[in-house]
Amino acid sequence: LEVFAREHGLKIGTIADLIHYRVRTEKTVERVSECTIPTEYGDFRLVAHQDCVDNELHLSLVLGEISPEEPTLVRVHMQNTLCDLFSTGHNACSWPMRRAMKQVAEAGRGVIVVLRNHDTTREIIQRMHDLQLHDRSDPVPPRDASPAHLRTFGVGAQILVDLGVRKMRVLSAPKSLHGISGFDLEVVEYVDCR
């Protein structure tokens, strides 16, 4: 592709370049409210962001001062009604919200972004089935990521940037985050669930 572009005098842009351009020209997330909320892990700043595309409200818990120069402990958490509401430590629930809050509190500063979604009846029943399968030691089948689910990565990234995060210590299993540099974000470390 690079040879073809050179031969025909064309410019090549990366996915990160495209994302960077769109973030500068098309902001789709807006901070709409903020307050202090006491939790069992201390007082966090609760920040609400409105997604202008689907009108969804996403929430973030921020602890301490966030500096773009310092790596920040970060968890981007997809809301899961069953796992979050009942605080289960079940392995089918991925990383428990309370555990992420505890780790951020122990670190003294960090950000937890909760990307909200409205679980349908079918999705809740499927998650209940996954819990039952996992109890029997059967593998939980992977779910294909829908285009809407994939879009949430960009929403989470915009929220992190708005909160002042640039370098991240991510509370998650390692994963490939193509184009994250287009948001001026950098993953410096993945932190295991304790």
Go through each PLM region and give its residues.
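Catalytic domains of riboflavin
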Residues: 1-194
